[in-house]
Amino acid sequence: MTLKLKHAEIWLANLNPTRGTEAGKCRPVLILQNQALLDAEHPSTLIIPLTTNLIEDAEPLRLRVKPADDLDKESDLLIDQIRSIDNKRLIKGPLTSCKIQFMERVYTAVAEVMGFDLES
């Protein structure tokens, strides 16, 4: 079965097994990968895991995601846990889709955590 993934969607993924401090378990993940790669059915996908273990004022390491559609709990995006996963780890979705205004905040947080200078 071919997944029809879209940039900015949130899907449920099985992130086990893990190593060290990696986020594990079955949990929602934000699809961060470029839409052209998704459309080409690339076998892996760049994601950001979510957690319901909320921490206040933790930007840029975390961004709060409000419940919507089938994402039923308030969550934090774990910006410092960005990783690529095999598409076989994606098990259900989309749970919801993030609006462009929120994704702009995600891009800024990712750039800051990764040390990209967007001002240049």
Tell where the protein language model's regions lie, with residue ranges.
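Short linear motifs in intrinsically disordered
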Residues: M1-L3, L54-I55
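C-terminal terminal-subdomain/extension
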Residues: L3, P67-S120
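Short, charged beta-turn/beta-strand-edge "cap" motif at the junction between a beta-strand
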Residues: N16-G20
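Compact nucleic-acid interaction/catalytic patches
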Residues: E22-C26, L30-P67
